């Protein structure tokens, strides 16, 4: 018998508002780095392994170059405000970094997966009411929020680096409230009431 696939767990938009996120962070190196990690996960949907693999040269003014699964490279657009956050982080990072990895510890060495996982888990614990907290939850959240705000499946597939559309379709789990809202706005009889 076929087992049912679990729906992705995701945070609500208001839980990850810029104002709410800003309240958690100061201006020291660790705070700036951690906020940038959180924002990159949420605003780009990249995987933990992709974040750790990022080099400084992979960042350009409106995009980042990501090396995904099976060494597939993809370009992901970033907002101007996210690029400014990256620049502010680089100003703190460059004097201490040992190598070209974008994300480093305060001793200049590259980040490692367990460190990032634990830090994101802590941050999501302060921001959300989710039971499950991880970088991958931010990937699910990115995908869900993109679809809920009008992104198409093909676009989302490209942004997430999925090999097939079937992998992306798991994010079409709109809430009933959203389905009802779309129905009310789109069906001609509902628009007349």
Language model features with spans:
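Conserved catalytic core of the tyrosine transesterase superfamily
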Residues: 1-193
